[in-house]
């Protein structure tokens, strides 16, 4: 919304949410939808990437319609986790693509394989590698990555890690800081 306040900018957001207003705080909203669903009984290791390709195809067709109407972005910022941005550079190759780089999956020590009580199976390792195809395909075309924390950025291997800039997306910790004179006491079942 901040960029949309400048009349020299045209900000467009593509959304899979139907029945949205035409704009929100100066941002033009363009709704689109997938033409198909995931394949029943598809191989378990490719369910994730198939869903992302389906969403990417839907966004690709929406982007083609936007281009046909005369819209050409200078910059595209997208969360790559759902696949929508997979093919946007095919429509607008000159646009700079920055992807929200939230997490690169690992078979050990991150989201799976970290608890000795629940050891990861070798097949899980294979599934995790295939799950990263979306990240790999995005970094093949992305000009930059944006990550909210240093830890999240650190989950990505090189050469991708060096393309990622950490930009905190939550509370402004420079403006919102602890107040040393404020305290809070709680009465608990333990008497404290």
Q: Which residue stretches match the model-derived regions?
A:
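Short, well-ordered alpha-helical microsegments
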Residues: 20, 83-86, 153-154
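Conserved nucleotide-sugar phosphate-binding/catalytic loop shared by glycosyltransferases and other
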Residues: 20-45
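Structural alpha-helical scaffold elements that stabilize or flank donor/cofactor-binding regions
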Residues: 69, 137-138
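Short N-terminal targeting/anchoring amphipathic segment
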Residues: 64-82, 96-98
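Carbohydrate-associated surface elements
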Residues: 151, 170
